[in-house]
Amino acid sequence: MNRIVFALGLALTSALTLFTPALSAAPAPEAWEIWDKADNSSEAVIDHSLWQAVLDSHLKPSADGINRFAYKALAAEGADTLKRYLAAMAKIDPRNYNAAEQQAYWINVYNAVTVNEVLKYPSKNSILRMGERFFSVGPWDDKVFEVAGEELTLNDIEHRILRPIFKDHRVHYAVNCASIGCPNLGAVAFSGAELETQLANQERDYLNHPRGLTFDKKGRLQLSQIYEWYGTDFAEDEKALVAHLAERHATLGDKLKTYTGDVNYDYDWDLNSAE
């Protein structure tokens, strides 16, 4: 029996190793047309206070500049506030709001759903080991949220709504995949009124953190794999990407402008757990 269990575990580990490289090719943005509608005359505001309450009580900033989340504590409490938030968001048709409110809505929903997904797999130490299917490499293709009569996956929200409809590269700094390598889960819920400032802050913070951009001991440029997976969301090619980053980095701009070496990409998929 132990040999069978060991063999199954080995097979799963091998499968994860085999399929993880596929993550280097992210889904292309392809608009889900039914969501490409907005009432830009609307001044109505979506209430994200329940999500803010979850962030206030369970998001833990760390000295290393990485925000971690107390998943186990939230699960032990029953996650009632998170559940109520997602239930409230499921009753809203975001198309009745202006574009900024919609974008904030989808980012918050994505992040809240991701937290909820992590709670379903308390023994897993990486989101890559989560998901409903036997050989899942993450929960991104699971149906995890329903709104306006449509069932959505996390990939739907990111690649069929946020990226193609709003066309803002900074969404990659806003959505959080529950991993150390990911841009921080923001401490303040996104809102239409503050969206521009919030996205700018998320971009600045990640770009200027070593997990976003750094030079190794040999002087080689190392970037987050986000810039590899979604490179054309930022620039037309790698050279233009480095120039794009040079314009935005607080201290390394001049060094980046003259850099002509290879670019290495890295990402830490460990769970961003505070426990």
Task: Indicate residue ranges for each PLM-predicted region.
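Bacterial N-terminal signal peptides
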Residues: 7-18
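Positively charged n-region of N-terminal signal peptides that target proteins for export
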Residues: 1-4
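Signal peptide processing junction and immediate N-terminal pro/mature segment
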Residues: 19-26
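Interaction/scaffold regions that mediate signaling and macromolecular assembly across diverse proteins
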Residues: 26-275
